[in-house]
Amino acid sequence: MKHFLTYLSTAPVLALXXXXXXAGLLIEINRFFPDALTFPFFSF
């Protein structure tokens, strides 16, 4: 039971860190390549 409670306390922390890193990566990509996500849809 102790290991299960440890898992419940660390999994949200790891998910938050992964989500923050993914969001930071998208922010940095959009800083260097602005409108890269919408550019192919409006290039006609």
Curated annotation (Swiss-Prot):
Membrane topology, record value: Single-pass membrane protein
GO BP terms: photosynthesis
Protein family (similarity comment): Belongs to the PsaJ family.
Compartment(s) of residence: Cellular thylakoid membrane
A GO-annotated cellular component: plasma membrane-derived thylakoid membrane
Keyword terms, alphabetized: Membrane, Photosynthesis, Photosystem I, Thylakoid, Transmembrane, Transmembrane helix
Pfam families xrefs: PSI_PsaJ (PF01701)
Name of the molecule in the record: Photosystem I reaction center subunit IX
Functional summary from the UniProt entry: May help in the organization of the PsaE and PsaF subunits.
Name of the gene: psaJ
Transmembrane segments: 7-27
